[in-house]
């Protein structure tokens, strides 16, 4: 059953990517982050209330860090979607799992201190090979699909995957502390709305496009559902 939920979440995530691609023709990345967060706040507040889950938390610092890295990843991903082919932007963001594996390998080696009581951890050759293969695969994919003027957007997309890895690890840490999912996602929505609003001061706002603005609604709904 958990595998089915993961497949459904991936489908919702991909569907949101399509909506972001359509909306990016009318809104910049900061606006998309802002409206995604604003719609998510309303939905998640109602969800938490229906589940009788209090939104007050004992771990504001951890939620703030999760929101910081999550919003950085979200903004970078939305920017990449607007500038790159959708499949390329999605693949770069999905690199988060490879980044997590790289962080785990690097963290284990950095934490090890050579003493007689703590021998050097076993070399995880298969894990290292998997990480390297993942990065090589992305490089091979990007070489034929990126134009010269898309190199910066490609780097931003790669950054979205790296920061998403930090965000996912923080979500795991919060869940181990007993934080409900709806509370964690609610604070992320708040962080998205605040960060997007601040960024709009510097990036400016787009002219309201009329009916195409309806793409903002499924972005917020699918984000909350995923």
Where are these regions (language model features)?
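Helix-loop interface residues and adjacent transmembrane-helix termini in multi-pass membrane transporters
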Residues: 26, 80-83, 120, 147, ...
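Hydrophobic/small/kink-forming positions within alpha-helical transmembrane segments
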Residues: 10-15, 45, 67, 71-75, ...
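Specific alpha-helical transmembrane segments that line the substrate/conduction pathway
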Residues: 31-38, 79-117
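Loop-to-transmembrane-helix transition segments
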Residues: 1-9, 53-78, 152-160, 207-225
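Hydrophobic transmembrane alpha-helices of multi-pass small-molecule transport proteins
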Residues: 102-105, 122-143
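Transmembrane alpha-helical segments that form core, pore/gating elements
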Residues: 44, 141, 145-203
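Glycine-/small-residue-enriched transmembrane alpha-helix faces in small-molecule transporters
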Residues: 1-31, 131-132, 136, 146-173, ...
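Transmembrane alpha-helices of multi-pass small-molecule transport proteins
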Residues: 2, 27-72, 100, 163-167, ...
């Amino acid at each position: 059953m958990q595998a089915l939920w993961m497949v459904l979440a991936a489908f919702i995530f991909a569907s949101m990517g399509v909506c972001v691609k359509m909306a990016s023709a009318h809104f910049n990345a900061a606006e998309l982050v802002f409206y995604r967060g604003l719609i998510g706040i309303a939905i998640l507040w109602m969800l938490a209330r229906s589940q009788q889950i209090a939104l007050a938390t004992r771990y504001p610092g951890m939620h703030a860090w999760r929101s910081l890295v999550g919003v950085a990843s979200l903004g970078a991903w939305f920017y990449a979607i607007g500038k790159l082919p959708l499949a390329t932007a999605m693949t770069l963001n999905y690199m988060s799992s490879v980044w997590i594996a790289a962080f785990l390998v690097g963290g284990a080696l950095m934490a090890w201190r050579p003493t007689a009581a703590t021998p050097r951890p076993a070399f995880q050759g298969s894990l290292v090979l998997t990480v390297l293969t993942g990065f090589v695969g992305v490089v091979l994919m990007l070489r034929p699909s990126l134009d010269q003027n898309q190199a910066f957007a490609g780097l931003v997309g790669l950054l979205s995957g790296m920061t998403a890895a930090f965000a996912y690890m923080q979500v795991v840490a919060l869940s181990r502390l007993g934080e409900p999912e709806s509370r964690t996602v609610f604070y992320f929505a708040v962080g998205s709305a605040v960060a997007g609003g601040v960024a709009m001061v510097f990036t400016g706002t787009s002219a309201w496009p009329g009916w195409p603005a309806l793409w903002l609604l499924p972005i917020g709904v699918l984000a909350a559902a995923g």
